Amino acid sequence: MDKFQRDGKEDTSRQWRFLYPLLFQEDLYTIAYDHYSNRSSSLEPMGNSSSNDRFSFLTVKRSISRIRQQNGSIVPFVNCDQNKLVGHNKSFYSELVLGGLTAIPGVPFSIRSKHPLEEXNEWTSFRSIHSIFPLMEDKIPHSNFILDIRIPHLTHPEILVRTFRRWIQDAPSLHSLRSVLHEHRNLIISSNLDQLILIASKENTRLSLFLWNYYAYECESLLVPLWKRFSHSRSLPYESFIERTPFYRKIEHIAIFYHKYLKKSLWFLKDPSIHYVKYRERSIIALRGTYLLVKKWRYHLTNFWQCHFHLWLQPYRIYIDELSNNGFSFLGYLLSAKMXPPVVKNKTVDDPFIPVLIXKGFDPAAPVXFLIGSLVKEKFCDISGHPFSRLAWTGLTDDDILDRFDRIWRNIFHYHSGSSKKDGLYHMKYILRLPCAKTLACKHKSAIRVVRERFGSELFTKSFPKERESIFLPFSKTRSQRERIWHSDIIQRNPSVNPWWKEHNLRIEPLFDR
């Protein structure tokens, strides 16, 4: 293991070529076997299913060796009853090779990690979600257009084989990978990532996620260098920033004696506002420029996917949002950049005055209509807000009923506490109070008025007052105008972070624990 780690440090290019050394070197089979047999490793035990009782890395290696000795031009397809590539039962060898492909790729990633994956807490595992909001709070107000990109999903196994071809230098390994992907097409073909996870079996879910993440990495690895080159290049203005060329030409004619320092001045004058955020199968590119520049970006992105991956990209997968007119939905929020006049007081010798300064500000809003629709879906109320009692909870104690409603409210409020306006959240709290009171009234066979008189202020606010004081303390007492507005204390991912617009063909997960 130490030798493999040292070799990885000597040549960093090997970290993305792990399939070749891990599947076709002697000592790494021992590493993978130790990693697989160790119960404390990050891999899940695979002994629950009957197919994995026959699994062994020695059998996998022998089957791969037999594959290498065959004619590589023969490719098995889904409709074949007999796998000619291995000469024996198709399902037996494909399951063995699939098991090896599932277990072995996790070895180099676990070596690169300082701590085992099972020791990582929830905050560490979801830290990337936390970093998205401060980035947007700082960068989005300086942008005026958003490219909302849905990463196109794979439609054919050969697309993945072509991407692996650049990293794997052994042709027989590509044929073995092709045979597995053709037989298990449901691992890569789906309408969205959630459906991909649901279709894949329990044993193959890790491989499905690995293939999807590798494909997403390929998309980003070829685009991010272009963005960095665009934002950090020191080339002439007419080569990089066509919109500002007339302005720079005027500078050349007016300030001729600054010609030697013109290039350095352009470094400070140019516009590098290009920001990229990705979550799951959705990417956001924030741009500052003209509408023509944004259309060019969409045109080039479309051509990139069509030419590089031989994949047709539907036009609706790259949507242009103008921040000045509309917002966009991301991670369960409605995000926009609105013009807000900050209060600035200036004092002079004669008399003080307040100038009017118009600046853009980041405006996150909670989607109240969507949250109310989620309450309707979970049968807490109807579409008009009329409450329903939870008859299934009437057999619980009063404290359990209060705790369940209180947990629902805290989950909603903690995640959406970064909203600039919280009137809609308090409206959600008022709607949830009524089903809570009605459930208790059905249990005690009394009226809602009697329940309110009995529980008083403890109704649905059993543990909320202390949290409300701690959450609003930065906003009401100690927060200055220069501080961030994002004080949300999220400790786990809320299902409401998934986008909800039906026109984007995305699925909404339930918000509440049943």
Swiss-Prot record:
One of its GO terms (biological process) is mRNA processing. Its main location: plastid. GO terms for cellular component: chloroplast. Keywords: Chloroplast, mRNA processing, Plastid, RNA-binding, tRNA processing. InterPro entries: Domain_X, Maturase_MatK, Maturase_MatK_N. GO terms for molecular function: RNA binding. The keyword Isomerase does not apply. It is found in: Plastid, Chloroplast. It comes from the Eukaryota. HAMAP family: MatK (MF_01390). Belongs to the intron maturase 2 family. MatK subfamily. Usually encoded in the trnK tRNA gene intron. Probably assists in splicing its own and other chloroplast group II introns. This is Maturase K.
